Amino acid sequence: MRLRLLALFCLAFAACLPARAEDTEPIKVGVLKFGTVNWVMDTIQTNGFDKAEGIELDVVPLASTQGTTVGLQAGSLDIVVTDWLLVSRERTSGAAFTMVPFSTALGAIMVPPDSPIKTLADLKGKTLGVAGGPLDKSWLLIVAYALRTANIDLRTETTQEFGAPPLLAARAKQGKIDAVLNYWPYAARLEAVGFTQLIGLEDVVRELGAKGEVAMLGYAFNAAWAEQNPSAIDGFVRAAEKANELLATSDAEWERLKPVMSANDPNFDEATFDALRRRFREGIPERRLTFEEADAKVLFQFLRELGGTKLVGPGTELAPGTFWHGTTQ
């Protein structure tokens, strides 16, 4: 009897112990070298959230978004961050990509201090920097919004300068362009040096029919991989949620992240730090997945109308399964 009780005690005690390294499931996560997802991955690893969930992250830094997509397609990466538009397009073409929300933080049109530009109509005849290219989703949503609310076609009534986000941010600070539509980390950096927001994408998507803050970006992965490794994907999602909870509440954790945030940014200062932290926190997803999916379906139609098949692929609606509802779907 004593031996049996001792054996039961040992089994119960072992179940309470954290997973050993050899028991963890490895997950390769592809990230842009200086992207904001690094902050979440660093938080997960430093605080042991991955090990506590029985997984071990292998973070793979990459130079371009194309590299993350290629890695996922080739199976050399398990998870990458991308937008639901790409996931939907890939699914329409036969791939089994799917995703869970990463961030609702969106870009904005920023104007310099003391700029005479106060409304979208004031952009007429001006030079507008646009991060990405003519088919960038943020740009096309802004175009749709301007047509609806200000009766201005930004494609024909402004001069666009397309380019990389850091280059356009620098040109805006140098006064070489009148305004810039940039991704949120660069918009936050401009805010830190006195630029103001003319219009944010959060307001744009609401005007176009979204019911809340939309997570355009998500953690994308292959559904077949998730079905074969349910504990791995579930553990990753829980670890990411724990990281977000910590980043939403702990200023000390952000202080620890400063070296990661300031990498490759010679102008990083306290104002930049505060702006990035605030905008990241505002972008932590909080809505139910069904709401995210419903809003994505609405926005998809605007993007299809303005970007055509070059942007959205051959599909006429958001591909079913774009958002991951778990292994029981």
Would you name each region that the model predicts?
Residues 7-15:
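Bacterial N-terminal signal peptides
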Residues 84-85, 166-261:
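Pocket-lining segment of extracytoplasmic ligand-binding domains
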Residues 297-329:
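Conserved C-terminal helix/tail region of periplasmic/extracytoplasmic solute-binding proteins
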